[in-house]
Structures are given as C-alpha cells and as structure tokens.
Amino acid sequence: MKKTYIILLVSLLALPTLAEENEKKTGITFEKYNFQSADLKEQKEDIDMENGVLGIADDRGFTLQSRDGKFIFKPYLFMQARGQYNYYDDEGLDKAYNQDNVANTGFSMPYAILGFTGTTFGRLDYNLSINAAATGGNVLQQGWIDYKISPAARFRAGKFKTPFFHAYLTTLGETLFPCLPTSLTASVILPYSLNAVTPSIGTGFDLGFQFHGKLKLTPKRENSWMMGYEVGLWNGSGSGVNTATKTLSDDAHIPSLLYAGRLTFMPWGNMPATQGNSHMLSGKHMLFGLSGGINVESESESTNDTRIGVEWSMLYGRWYAATEAYWMHVSFTERQKIDKSYNFWGCYGQLGYFFTKNLQAGFRYDFLDRNGSGKDGFLNMPAAVVNYYVNKCNLKLSAMYQFTGRYGHANQLDRDNDDLGLSTHSATLQLQYSF
C-alpha cells in the first residue's frame, strides 16, 4: 500500500514536467484564460464575439491553442435560470368563466448550453452549441463552419443567426434585457382562422448559407470607417426544424426559401455584438444598419413575408443606446384564395448605463402594430432592468419589469384582441453563468 501511495505522489509531481515536455513537442499551450486575459480583467475595447454565445477573447474559461495561433479550441458552458411572474388581463371575459389572471409563472431555464468553438488552419472558424434545456430541433442551438478568404470575404454554412435585427444579433447573454423586445417575438394577428399562419417580425436562428465580411473604408485612419455585409439563403422554417422541408414556389417558381441580407456602417471601427459589457467601459463604437428579406411560401406554404428594418446602436464609455424600426408585409399565396395583404410595424428604443463596474441599469420602450396598419391601435411596452455583474465568478444577475399597454383602438373588442396571449404585467429575475 505504501508503494502505491509513493507511485501516485511521484506521478502527480511529474505532471508539470510532462506537460512542459508535451508543449515543446506539440506546440500546444493550455491556458486558464484566453488572449490578453490580464488586460481583460480590467478593460478591453473590443472582444471577438463571432460565435454568438461567448466571446472568444474574454477571460471566461480557458483555451487550447497552438503557438502560431492557427489552431484554437475553446469549450464553453452557458446557463440561464429564471423566475417569472406574468399577470394577464381578463380580455373582456366575465368573471363567471373563472379564468386565471396569473399564468406562465414559476421557474424556467431557457438556456443550458455546452459548446465548442475555435479556429483551424488560421482560416476556418467553427462553433457547435447544444442547448440541453430545449426540445426537438432547438436542442441544436447552432452549429456552423466559417471559411475566411480575407476579413472582407467569408463563407458560413450551417445553423446560425439570420442577418436581421440588432436585438437578435447581439451575443447571447450580452443583451441589456433578459427578454427580447415583444415587437420582435409576438405573433401578429390576422383576421383569418389559419392556425398555421402565425408569423412574427423576428426571424432568429435558421439553417442556411451566408456570404459576409467587413471592409475598412478609410484604412489609413486609426479608427477607420468600416462597412459590414451579410447576404444569404436560409430554409425560413425557424430554429426548430433541422431538416430540408422546402419546395419550389408555385407562384414565383423559385425555391421557397428565406432570402435575406444586411448592410452596416461603423464610423468608429468594429462594433462588438454587445449591449453592455463590464470589461468594455471605455472606448466608443457606433453602427448604422439596413436589413431586409423575403420568406417565400412561409407559414406552411401559405404566405410570402417581406421584412425591412433599420437600426442604430452605440457604445460610448459606460453608455449604451440603440433603436430599431421594422416593417413586415404579409401576402397570401394563390392557393389560399385571399387577395388582401397586410402590413405590420414595430420599433423600440433602449438606453443603458454602468453606474459602477458591476452595476448596469436600463430602460426600453417598445411599440408593436400587432393587428395591422389597416386597423387603429397599437401596443406600447415600457420596461426597466437592473443588471449586476459578479466578474470574479462570471455571474450576471438581472431583474426586469415590463408593462403592456394598449392605445388608440377603435373599440373595446379590438383592444382586448390586440394583446391576446401577452401578459399585462411581467417580472423576471434571472441568474446567468458562463465559463
């Protein structure tokens, strides 16, 4: 038994020597933190957030990399746990129906992600994220490869975010609010009883192919004007479908896919995909964007949905500000025998500020013309949030409240119908951990 203990002790003492020898032979280094981690504990003006979940160059977790930096492997973990309270209006129903005003209340876990990201051969980036908290096709949160010819010319294929809306394209966990604007996530209301036709303005994750890149427009300047572009094809069936289910459009005679693109301009250099980061409390970044797309024969081959959006966002020291406006046109396919088309719009503005290195507060005002521009009335949704960062433990605590108001409707029935399925009062407490 004593010999066994002695052998184990010698083996443990020899591990550092063996690791050092292995590093010399293979050129692989193992680090507790990523590149420039010492600086990142204090300040950094820009963090690589290309993988959409966790910044590749921040101080969370560890990285395996070759000496020349051409091979990088970073495993990561990301979790969010929420406590939610939702109060719903009676919607004109008599109390005799004994409906529950409090619903969809309790605890939830929207994300429990394990993933791998990195680079191979200095040109090929990759990312795989498995969300154990999801079901069905959403378990594969994203999975893609990205080949870089140059910074201005890159190809990406797999499951990833469609190029529409600053709110969606922000890195997961880097948003000011725990919940996305309702104007992007709520389904619009159509005056037809078609259960399969419930489009929302937001598009989110999807399977497809994208050509994208960023160019310096004034390369001689230190903080150069930059232009970014993203254009591609996607299934248009959403994040819950990982199979090829599309056909050819009977009306347009083209593949029934989502055709989308986005063009951005950044006057102060590259704009990181964050709405406030406790490691980025200095420097300035700004972005102007224009995006659009058409989803051919979407909603179970029932509609053709066209979307257009404009966006502006800024990081300036401890401040963050953003505003977006978007419009969606829904027309029915010929097989539906519905000649009418409908237009919907939404917009929001939000502002955040770091009062200390750990404490951020924010406000958002969100608008949605949910019943279409042909009817009077819209929804307005003010919201407030407080975020507290425990940087030593990679924790983020968030508390959010949102009110859903109704304004300008022609009658009480339209008023009651416009917020069906949406809570009047919503409160969220969220704990977020990343490694």
Predicted features and spans:
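Outer membrane beta-barrel
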Residues: 61-239, 255-271, 277, 347-362, ...
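Sec-dependent N-terminal signal peptides
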Residues: 4-13
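N-terminal periplasmic/intermembrane-space "pro-region" immediately following the signal or transit peptide
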Residues: 17-78, 221-225, 435
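Extracytoplasmic loops and strand-loop junctions of Gram-negative outer membrane beta-barrel proteins
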Residues: 58-59, 95-99, 189-195, 246, ...
